[in-house]
Structures are given as structure tokens and as C-alpha cells.
Design a protein with these regions (language model features):
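Tandem repeat domain/solenoid detector
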Residues: 23-376
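Gram-negative bacterial Sec-dependent N-terminal signal peptides
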Residues: 1-22
Length: 377
């Protein structure tokens, strides 16, 4: 008859701790398979819940509510472990989760909190880390993943001065940050490796900032913003990377910078009838890069700078007061710019071979100045 060794004798062990006063501390350590650890703390201040598990298929849960200066720390080593931390109606709270292995799942939920922080660290493959913050003030969420086939998600809604940061190093990772109906929110995605995807979505927000930085090959990055006073910064360094920025609202700014070969950049901005002051900038260095800028509204400025060969820049501006300043250096560059409205201006310089400029302006007081140097421009 098969028997478990002493090291895994903690199989199917359930540990539960409940506390309803101040300065409570609960520490749980488990070794084995399919262990379950639970901590429930409510009220008071200075509560601490610390859980450590090593093995396979373990589950750790912490619930803290109606308290201040509370801390939840969960550490798991092994495979197919689950860590869940829930904090509600708390102030000055922090939740930290550390996992090593593969197939692990970490979740942090913070609701109605003030000055909350969530930190998740995962090392391995096929891990999932998710953070949900709702109705929070001055909240922050940081997720760091190392390995491949990992998924990181940060969702912040109805928040003030929220910040989400996702860092991934490896291959075939997916990072997603969603911020909804928030004020002064900020999203940062940093990816290193190959075949990674980054998505930042900021919906109905005011003063939102999105930053995406990717270094490697065949990475895709997309930013979508709706609301007022947006800023999007994207840096893509490597080969065959793609950048997509979509902004809708007023007072938008988009900046995309790419290094390498075969890069693709696209910026789309749309305004309300009374909006304006949008800016779109793309800078590309390398070979076979593309830049596409599409603006609707008023008082917009588009700037594209391309160095290298086979670059293509296409700009479409509609409205009034638009300006475009472009510079192309290299071989086989092409620019197509269309402006509709009044007070539009296009000024550009093309250096190299086989450059082509096609400019169309409709309206009044438009100015187009293009200088081409080289052969067969």
C-alpha cells in the first residue's frame, strides 16, 4: 500500500485563523500537496497576515477589512499554487505575493481603500497574476514576471491617482492594464524578450498617462485612451515590432519612438467638436519602418522623423489649425499628407534616393514647403 513520505504528510491540511481586534499577527507555513491556508482579519489597525507554502496544488487566502495599516504577505514555491488576497474598506494597506514555479495563480483584490499597494512577483512559466482595485485613492499596483507564457493583468476603476506597473522579462508574455473612470491615473508596461504583447486601456479618464517600453523581437504594443488630457509614450527597440496608439477626447499627446528593422507605428486621434491641442509624434530609425498618423479635430500637430530605408509616412488631418513637420532620410522613403480645413501647414525635407512626397491641401491659408535632395525624388 502506498504511503506518503513524512515531508508531504501535510496533505489536505486546512489552516484557518480569524481575528477581530487590533495588532493581530497570523503566520502560517505549510509543506506538501493540496494544502489550504486561510486568514480572516477585521477591524483595528496594524494587522499582519503572513503565509508560506511549498509544494504542489496549495491554496492561500487572506481577507482583511475595516482596518488600517494592514499587511498581507503570501509566498509560494512549487507548481499549480493559488494565492488570493482581499482587502476592503482599509487605509494604508499593502498586499505582496511571491511565487516561483509554473502554473501558479496570484490574485489581489482591493476595494474602497486609501493609499493601498499591491505587489506581485512571479518567476517561471504559464503563471497568471491579476490585480483588481476599485474605488481607491492613491493606489498602486506592481507586477513583475520572469519567464515565458506568463499573463499579467491590472484593473483599476473609479480610482484617484492610481498607478499600474507591469514588468515582464521573457518570451510569449502578455501584459494588460485597464483603468476606467479614473482621475490622474498612470499605466506603465515594460517588456523584454520576444513575441510579447502589451495592452493599455484607459477609458473615460482625466489626466491619464500611458507608457509602454518594449525591447526585443516581434513585440506588439497597443494603447487606447478616451477622456480628457491624455498622454501616451511608446518606445519599441528591436525587429518587427508594432506600435498602435488610439486616442479619443480632448488635449491628447502621443509619442512613439522605434529603433530597428521592420517597425510599424500608427497613431489615431479623434476630438469632440470643441476639442483641440492634440499632438502626435513618431520617430523611427532603421529599415522598412512605417508611420501612420490620423487626426480629426482642431489645433493638431503631427511630426514624423524617419531615418533609414523603405520608410513610409502617411498623415491625414481634418479640421483647422493643423501643422505637419516631417523629415525623411535614406532610400525609398515616401510621404502622403492630406489636410482639410484652414490654417494648415506642411513643412518637410527629404534626403536620399527614390523619395516621393504627395501633399493635398483643401481650404484657405494653407502652406506647403517641401525640399528634396538626392535622385529620382
Amino acid at each position: 500500500m502506498f504511503k506518503f513520505k513524512p515531508l508531504v504528510a501535510a496533505i489536505l491540511t486546512v489552516a484557518t485563523a480569524q481575528a477581530f481586534a487590533a495588532n493581530n499577527t497570523s503566520e502560517q507555513d505549510q509543506l506538501g500537496i493540496n494544502n489550504v491556508a486561510q486568514v480572516l482579519q477585521s477591524g483595528g489597525s496594524g494587522n499582519l497576515a503572513k503565509q508560506g507554502q511549498s509544494g504542489f496544488g496549495n491554496q492561500a487566502t487572506v481577507e482583511q477589512s475595516h482596518s488600517r495599516e494592514t499587511t498581507a504577505t503570501q509566498s509560494q514555491a512549487g507548481n499549480y499554487n493559488v494565492a488570493d488576497a482581499q482587502q476592503s474598506a482599509t487605509a494604508l494597506t499593502a498586499a505582496t505575493q511571491n511565487q516561483r514555479g509554473w502554473g501558479n495563480d496570484a490574485t489581489v483584490e482591493q476595494t474602497g481603500t486609501y493609499k493601498t499597494g499591491a505587489t506581485q512577483n512571479q518567476n517561471g512559466i504559464h503563471n497568471v497574476a491579476e490585480t483588481f482595485q476599485t474605488g481607491t485613492t492613491t493606489s498602486s499596483a506592481t507586477t513583475e514576471q520572469t519567464g515565458k507564457h506568463n499573463y499579467g493583468l491590472i484593473t483599476q476603476s473609479a480610482a484617484i491617482n492610481s498607478q499600474g506597473k507591469l514588468v515582464q522579462d521573457g518570451e510569449l508574455n502578455n501584459a494588460s492594464i485597464t483603468q476606467t473612470a479614473s482621475w490622474g491615473d498612470r499605466a506603465l508596461v515594460d517588456q523584454r524578450g520576444t513575441d510579447n504583447d502589451a495592452h493599455v486601456t484607459q477609458v473615460a479618464s482625466l489626466g491619464s498617462i500611458a507608457e509602454v517600453e518594449q525591447v526585443g523581437w516581434r513585440n506588439d504594443a497597443m494603447v487606447s485612451q478616451t477622456g480628457h488630457q491624455h498622454e501616451a509614450y511608446m518606445l519599441s527597440d528591436g525587429n518587427n515590432n508594432r506600435v498602435d496608439i488610439d486616442q479619443s477626447g480632448n488635449a491628447q499627446n502621443a509619442f512613439a519612438l522605434q529603433y530597428g528593422n521592420g517597425n510599424d507605428s500608427r497613431i489615431t486621434q479623434s476630438n469632440s467638436p470643441f476639442g483641440g491641442n492634440n499632438t502626435a509624434t513618431t520617430e523611427q530609425f532603421g529599415t522598412a519602418n512605417e508611420a501612420d498618423i490620423n487626426q480629426h479635430g482642431r489645433n493638431q500637430t503631427a511630426k514624423t522623423i524617419q531615418h533609414g530605408g523603405f520608410n513610409v509616412a502617411s498623415v491625414d488631418q481634418q479640421g483647422r489649425g493643423n501643422e505637419l513637420h516631417f523629415q525623411q532620410d535614406g532610400v525609398g522613403n515616401e510621404l502622403n499628407a492630406v489636410q482639410n480645413g484652414s490654417d494648415n501647414e506642411i513643412v518637410g525635407v527629404s534626403h536620399g534616393w527614390h523619395n516621393s512626397s504627395d501633399i493635398e491641401q483643401t481650404g484657405g491659408d494653407n502652406l506647403a514647403t517641401v525640399r528634396q535632395e538626392g535622385t529620382l525624388n
